[in-house]
Each structure stands twice: as C-alpha cells, then as structure tokens.
Amino acid sequence: MATTYATGKRKTAVAKVWVKSGSGKIIVNGMDLNTWLGGHEAIKLKVVQPLLVTKQETSMDIKATTLGGGYSAQAEALRHGISRALASMDADFRALLKPKGLLTRDSRTVERKKYGRRKARRSPQFSKR
C-alpha cells in the first residue's frame, strides 16, 4: 500500500502526516510518540484515537511533523491529520471516523483584541466618580 499524505490543523498548530502500512510505529518530529509527548498519557490517547476507532493501531506506520501552537494543539492537529489520511485511504474508515467527529476541523481560535479594551472582552475598570 502506498503512503498517504494529509494535513491537520488546530488553533495555530499544523501537522503534516504520512501514513503507510507497517508495524504501528509513530514518529513525530523525528522522535518516538512517547518521547515527543514526555509521558502525557491523556494526550497520547487523543493522538491514537483515530487508529483505535479504525482498529489499525498495529498495522499503520505514521510519520509526522508539527509546528505552531502548544503540545495540546499540536496533538489535536496530529489527530486531525491522521484521521484525514485514514479516511482518504479507505472509504470504510471514513464511515467510522465521521460519526466520532474526527474528520471535523475544530474552528475555535483566539478572539482578537479590540481597541479601547484590555483584552478581547475585558474592559478597563469603571469608576462611577
């Protein structure tokens, strides 16, 4: 089976993902997934969720590069990229991933700061007198 490429995004993080048949190795930014995450098990479960849903955790090799955002946003971008790559490999995978919401881009981003305000919504302190 050929290598499939997809991109995933979350906030300002972007993940470029290459998926191919293999033994279940996941390499992110040249490091093993566990090394890259530094032992964050909750985030690891988030990343491998598309593989668990499609039951491909031991039959797909994944190579990915991530940039922008923090660890959590990069992990969710990686999950989105893996989901999109799997969906383009097999239509049956798409039918499994779509109901779980794994193919949907989470469009929530930081609200911009407005002038006359301290933050996006925080106003300066009001003094009555």
From Swiss-Prot:
Gene Ontology molecular function, alphabetical: RNA binding; structural constituent of ribosome
Chain spans, region Disordered: 107-129
Highest taxon above the source species: Bacteria
Coiled-coil region list: none
Name of one Pfam family that matches: Ribosomal_S9
UniProt-listed GO biological process terms: translation
Basic residues bias locations: 114-129
Keyword annotations: Ribonucleoprotein, Ribosomal protein
Keyword Calcium: no
Family per record: Belongs to the universal ribosomal protein uS9 family.
PANTHER family in UniProt: RIBOSOMAL PROTEIN S9, SMALL RIBOSOMAL SUBUNIT PROTEIN US9M
Protein name as annotated: Small ribosomal subunit protein uS9
Gene: rpsI
